[in-house]
Amino acid sequence: MILAIDVGNSNIVIGCCEDGKIAFSERISTSRENTALEYAISFKTILELYNIKQNEIDGAIISSVVPSVTTTIKLAIKKIAGIDAKIVGPGTKTGLNIIIDNPAQLGSDLVVDAVAGISEYKLPLIIFDMGTATTASVIDSKGSYLGGMIIPGVNVSLNALTAGTSQLPKINLEPPKKVISSNTVDCMKSGIIFGQASLIDGVIDRFEEELGQKCTVIATGGLSGSIIPYCKRK
């Protein structure tokens, strides 16, 4: 069984895979202050919830966009499973052909998104990963990573809206009843949710126009479920 850890700016996703199937997936908050022991306790508790014994873990892999936390997570895995986790990064052999100006700059999260997408879906691909930032990746019909786009994330946009204005309140991320809203809170919800959904629709159109062909579109990340249902493109 493989223990997989995805370290994002806001959340850490932990899961186990066996024989190509996902045994479970859970999410905890990313804390740059936590020690290896604190993370080890969290991971051990999650494994116990799913009745997975530490000696059942044969290997571990980490994808991280938070360098200051990466080593701490690796030490935490060593504590609970007694194994050295592999870290996805420059030099990791994934088989992905990366055609960008500096392949070493491509984040590990985008690498694993692309590798998984190529494995599971019909090419060419557009992959949206919606977390603290929203990233859009394009993989061509040959399975090569061409590049993409980085967009302010849903919560980043919402927080900027409330922080930069004096009279706009903090709101929950839930859809209003109508796109054309009639009060401040619903107008903000409409702008964030339908605005982000329209942004994604527009990016897809522009990517496909530049590629000259239709693509399979995939969305992942903690905030995708809040936005993707309101996209016109399926």
Protein language model regions, located:
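Generic hydrophobic alpha-helical segments
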Residues: 39, 43-47, 113-117, 121, ...
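Short beta-strand-loop/turn "lid" adjacent to the catalytic site in phosphate-handling enzymes
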Residues: 50-106, 142-149, 153-154, 182-193, ...
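ATP-binding/phosphotransfer module of carbohydrate and carboxylate kinases, centering on a glycine-rich
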Residues: 2-4, 157-234
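Short phosphate-engaging motifs
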Residues: 35, 69, 135, 157, ...
